[in-house]
Amino acid sequence: MRKIIVGSRKSKLALTQTNWFIDQLKALGLPYEFEVKEIVTKGDVILDVTLSKVGGKGLFVKEIEHALLTKEIDMAVHSMKDMPAVLPEGLMIGCTPKRVDPRDAFISKNGASFKELAEGAILGTSSLRRSAQLLAARPDLQVKWIRGNIDTRLRKLKEEDYDAIILATAGLQRMGWDNEVITEHLDETLCVPAVGQGALAIECREDDKDLLQLLAHMNDGVTEKTVAAERVFLHKLEGGCQVPIAGYATLTENDAIELTALVGSMDGSVLLKETVVGTDPEKVGLEAADRLIKQGAKELILAANKGQQ
């Protein structure tokens, strides 16, 4: 019986996701056993500055990918939105399980909705994507950076001078906390989700054919297709955490991919948004990027990167 070593970050959410996925594999009843190896990533250690200032994408995966390449672990369970658009040579996404709710969750201190927040209220987020879109809708709000895992952020909302914070619905759902803490879900038209938000990425070595066969049982075709379109868009625009960038795709009734893509200025005064429909994930992602580039997306990205230096 083969023992599969599964790499995971140490946070409660990461371990919950990893153990959930292992349980799905165990339920297949195949001759494998599993062991979790906890790995500390740079993103877990640097908590005093915003993600965008310390290098953005890859902050939560580099050390785990190193462990994959050196064969310390066999596979890793990541949040898809933490994955860089390009993976190191020799590694691949072995499967994409079914995506859960991709929306952003709005959590306020006193139960007020986003629209009901008082003028000048303080909104906590560490995401340029969220802050740009929410400032576009409510320029009167103040954004204050907030870092830390889910528990830490919920505690800061209670104890510090935040009126509301934004978290991913998916993480709260996986922790079983969604019903008790979420004030409202932000509609995708108000706040387009991050590329891959709500999906998991199971990363492994390309040459591990045995493991790839096992992972194939857990792949969700719709999630794979839609997330692929989002990631092609992200790659073409070379966007990471340093840029207000968003992409969310769904499958229409006719099995076409519908991708809504967005790039914004840091303060939300400019939001470029396009929706592209097609059957091929790569073509849809590239088309969305090309349309936004024609509108000036590259200039916005350049300005955002300069603003982070």
Curated annotation (Swiss-Prot):
Pathway: Porphyrin-containing compound metabolism; protoporphyrin-IX biosynthesis; coproporphyrinogen-III from 5-aminolevulinate: step 2/4. It catalyses: 4 porphobilinogen + H2O = hydroxymethylbilane + 4 NH4(+). Its cofactor is dipyrromethane. One of its GO terms (cellular component) is cytoplasm. The modification S-(dipyrrolylmethanemethyl)cysteine is found at residue 241. It holds the Pfam family Porphobil_deam. GO terms for molecular function: hydroxymethylbilane synthase activity. It is an enzyme of class 2 (transferase). GO terms for biological process: protoporphyrinogen IX biosynthetic process. The porphobilinogen subunits are added to the dipyrromethane group. Belongs to the HMBS family. Monomer. This is Porphobilinogen deaminase.
